Swiss-Prot record:
Positions bearing Phosphoserine: 338-339, 344, 351
Keyword Transmembrane: yes
Pfam families in alphabetical order: 7tm_1 (PF00001)
Function: Receptor for a number of inflammatory CC-chemokines including CCL3/MIP-1-alpha, CCL4/MIP-1-beta and RANTES and subsequently transduces a signal by increasing the intracellular calcium ion level. May play a role in the control of granulocytic lineage proliferation or differentiation. Participates in T-lymphocyte migration to the infection site by acting as a chemotactic receptor.
One function term, GO molecular function aspect: chemokine (C-C motif) ligand 5 binding
Cytoplasmic side: 61-70, 127-143, 221-237, 304-354
Subunit structure: Interacts with PRAF2. Efficient ligand binding to CCL3/MIP-1alpha and CCL4/MIP-1beta requires sulfation, O-glycosylation and sialic acid modifications. Glycosylation on Ser-6 is required for efficient binding of CCL4. Interacts with GRK2. Interacts with ARRB1 and ARRB2. Interacts with CNIH4. Interacts with S100A4; this interaction stimulates T-lymphocyte chemotaxis.
Gene Ontology biological-process annotations: apoptotic process; calcium ion transport; calcium-mediated signaling; cell chemotaxis; cell-cell signaling; cellular response to lipopolysaccharide; cellular response to transforming growth factor beta stimulus; cellular response to tumor necrosis factor
Name of the molecule in the record: C-C chemokine receptor type 5
Amino acid sequence: MDFQGSIPTYIYDIDYSMSAPCQKVNVKQIAAQLLPPLYSLVFIFGFVGNMMVFLILISCKKLKSMTDIYLFNLAISDLLFLLTLPFWAHYAANEWVFGNIMCKLFTGIYHIGYFGGIFFIILLTIDRYLAIVHAVFAIKARTVNFGVITSVVTWVVAVFVSLPEIIFMRSQKEGSHYTCSPHFLHIQYRFWKHFQTLKMVILSLILPLLVMVICYSGILNTLFRCRNEKKRHRAVRLIFAIMIVYFLFWTPYNIVLLLTTFQEYFGLNNCSSSNRLDQAMQVTETLGMTHCCLNPVIYAFVGEKFRNYLSVFFRKHIVKRFCKHCSIFQQVNPDRVSSVYTRSTGEQEVSTGL
């Protein structure tokens, strides 16, 4: 498959898009050995972390704020994305054996989860901006109802931008094996290939970073007027960590994606360069996937409020079930945890929202 998009990239034996057929047996062999264990690790760690966020929000926090709504939907997006990885891992090691319907279904789930995760990260960034920079306005604007409405709209947008991948993906026999790959009419191939790549780069890198720069610049300006220097320094460090982590995890993939799609314009449309780009795609794509493992840490567990709920959940559901005589760990007062953090000022958002 010589089309490069956000679907996990599997390279087959020959690339016919070159002027002369390009043998890619070695690239496929490396993918078969490298990708399944990496995808498995991403699936395990990402599933555990996001499932913990999901369960805590349902059982402890009860989705009482707009932030909770967005965190809940971010966890769902990451879980949808992650649930497809075992199938892509099998595909990387073998061939596509799940049929055409499942090819389209898993492609759709993968992309909807992928774009949904990006969009909810953007909404969380805007939510923090409103809470800290426009604290008085945020009291009226940041409601559960508004969070639900914007979440529904976000899912609709995520489905819409995923439609081209769902429509064009098809399972068919190519040579001696079955593939799950996009199939365009020959006259449309170049247009859709460029369109998909530019859509990916704009939605997954340029737009999120633009929103982060604008919102976090406003937040930093407000934080520098905060009287509590300790909270200010902690919040500033977290802001830079969020931006740097997102940039480091997704920029390499998007750069390689651009180079691969427009390789003829960079003088890279030869077999050796194509093979190196394919190998780089495998590494950078997996690196980008691991970002969903960090979302629970960056957007949930880093907050003091959420860590208290995690402690309550652990004691109530884990310790109580597996250590019935450990009474010291079961002395939990959930009401106290929820009542400690009821203030809604800008400074409180600095300490708990960030």
